[in-house]
């Protein structure tokens, strides 16, 4: 996986590219879930690039993966801020010409907010997997269980494999839902 860092608004963001560049083909931008990062996409980006002939770009938001840490708690507007402020800068920086945003969970919400708030003619489509359009008690109960597993089980150890700042990644996600 060819990774490189992007400097965006004073933050270092981990990014990776698969397949052709933005001058050669449309680009599919992957937006990860609340505890995700570039590495957790595993071989999906390479397979997606091969199957579609498109370039695929993924990045780890600040606080995740190998990206810069962030101060906690996150503001409740963090997904809106990412969609309206950070994502447009990333698209510009990578030379995004046209393509789609593909998001899972928090990433799907960010893609949805971006599509609704930014009139970006380069974004031709969005594919959303489990965006946060409403909250269910079952989901909140699962997030509380994740906190228990993180604090008293082995979830922290497992996440530390993927996140340089594991407490930042976990509590940035968990706290946004439970605080």
Give the role of each language-model region:
Residues 45, 91, 114-115:
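A conserved amphipathic alpha-helix that caps or lines the catalytic cleft of carbohydrate-
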Residues 131, 135-136, 140-179:
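The alpha/beta-hydrolase serine catalytic core
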Residues 52, 58-98:
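Active-site loop/oxyanion-hole signature of alpha/beta-hydrolase fold enzymes
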Residues 44-49, 73-75, 119, 142-146:
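Glycine-rich, phosphate-binding/catalytic loops in enzymes
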Residues 14-69:
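Conserved HGGG/HGGXW glycine-rich cap/lid loop of the alpha/beta-hydrolase fold
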Residues 97-136:
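Conserved hydrolase catalytic core segment
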Residues 1-12:
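N-terminal cap/lid segment of alpha/beta-hydrolase-fold proteins
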């Amino acid at each position: 996986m060819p990774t490189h860092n992007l400097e965006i608004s004073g933050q270092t963001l981990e990014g990776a590219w698969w397949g052709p560049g933005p001058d050669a083909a449309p680009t599919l931008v992957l937006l990860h879930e609340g505890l995700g990062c570039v590495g957790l996409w595993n071989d999906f980006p390479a397979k997606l690039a091969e199957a579609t002939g498109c370039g695929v770009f993924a990045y780890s938001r600040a606080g995740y993966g190998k990206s810069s840490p962030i101060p906690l708690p996150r503001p409740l507007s963090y997904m809106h801020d990412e969609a309206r402020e950070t994502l447009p800068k990333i698209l510009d920086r990578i030379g995004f010409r046209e393509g789609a945003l593909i998001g899972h969970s928090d990433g799907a919400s960010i893609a949805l907010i971006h599509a609704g708030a930014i009139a970006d003619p380069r974004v031709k489509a969005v594919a959303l997997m489990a965006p946060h359009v409403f909250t269910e008690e079952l989901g909140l109960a699962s997030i509380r269980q994740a906190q228990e597993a993180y604090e008293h089980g082995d979830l922290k150890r497992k996440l530390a494999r993927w996140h340089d700042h594991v407490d930042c990644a976990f509590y940035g996600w968990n706290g946004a839902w439970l605080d």
